Amino acid sequence: MMGTILNPYFGEFGGMYVPEILVPVLKQLEKAFVEAQHDPVFQQEFQDLLKNYAGRPTALTLCRNLTKGTKTKLYLKREDLLHGGAHKTNQVLGQILLAKRMGKTRIIAETGAGQHGVATALACAMLDMPCRVYMGAKDVERQSPNVFRMRLMGAEVIPVEKGSCSLKDACCEAMRDWSANYETTHYLLGTAAGPHPFPTIVREFQKMIGEETKCQILAKENRLPDAVIAAVGGGSNAIGMFAEFIAEKSVQLIGIEPAGNGIHTGKHGAPLRHGSIGIYFGMKSPIMQTQDGQIEESYSISAGLDFPSVGPEHAYLHTIGRAQYESITDDEAIEAFQALAKHEGIIPALESSHALAYALKLIVQNPEKEQLLVVNLSGRGDKDIFTVDKILTEKGII
């Protein structure tokens, strides 16, 4: 791709597959990002906001009860404690500072679970930027607490009634808005996917998750973990955790996609293991698509994982074998959600519950194995309590 400063590809994945009208805008964004990375004033403001507004560094918490009777030590990286309730706040602050640097006067965003929307709304309120959030109508219904939070903080929330009324449709509407208003508007993309330079920007603005984890685990255990585990939808919390450990070959990187009702049912959101390569959302990456290239509907109980593609760096890490990607069903995630609440007094987001469920599987499979695991607890579960309550009530569990 001619004229980019940074490499727009991760192996064969990534790129900038957008209408011609948006190419100069993406190049402007890339230039602003590269300059900001080398600007001590920008970095100082970003770090100050992370520390004094968002509440970094976040804790690394040892599970005291979940691993009883086993030889595993399980730590949780507590992104749920970040202001806004999830890891999303990290990169939102960075992108809004970039937007201001470029002279943009309006922010738009897409959101699935509502966490990125909340993070965008709170940061826009604090940094005094008008904000519009596109959200699938289905997600507006299942994430009503977050919709109220966004509106309370001054964001305009637009329910998207098209297609499957989910995250992919919200992404499409946000792209349409941006294409029409790019001169004044910054599209604050919420995950490590989309056209270049978004996957790189989001990784760089999330990588403090892994950097902090590395320092914290060395201080507590005097060694690196055997594995770090994170849920993967678009992939921002996972790449934020993985980035610092990619060069540490002794550390397994495990990403967890949503198996939904089970891979065999077709109702899942696992394009890495069960999709095929194509062009979607401005990038080349694995997608859930039909044989004639129509995008299939993804499914997960977790709105934030309900996405038919995945960030290109994850596709690359999967292809070269540096990271492994597994899947967890809705039922397994709900069990993990309950277990963490009951035994550790922490209510995780359903997204994070997928990663936790896989960690618990590893522990149960080999209780005598001495292992040190870290799960990225990417968000808190307040937004999911009504969904889980309904399911458990229907099953007669509560």
Swiss-Prot record:
Pathway: Amino-acid biosynthesis; L-tryptophan biosynthesis; L-tryptophan from chorismate: step 5/5. It catalyses: (1S,2R)-1-C-(indol-3-yl)glycerol 3-phosphate + L-serine = D-glyceraldehyde 3-phosphate + L-tryptophan + H2O. The modification N6-(pyridoxal phosphate)lysine is found at K88. Its EC number is 4.2.1.20. It is an enzyme of class 4 (lyase). Its cofactor is pyridoxal 5'-phosphate. One of its GO terms (cellular component) is cytoplasm. Keywords: Amino-acid biosynthesis, Aromatic amino acid biosynthesis, Lyase, Pyridoxal phosphate, Tryptophan biosynthesis. One of its GO terms (molecular function) is tryptophan synthase activity. PANTHER family: TRYPTOPHAN SYNTHASE, TRYPTOPHAN SYNTHASE-RELATED. Belongs to the TrpB family. This is Tryptophan synthase beta chain. It comes from Histophilus somni (strain 2336) (Haemophilus somnus). The lineage of its organism: Bacteria, Pseudomonadati, Pseudomonadota, Gammaproteobacteria, Pasteurellales. The gene is trpB.
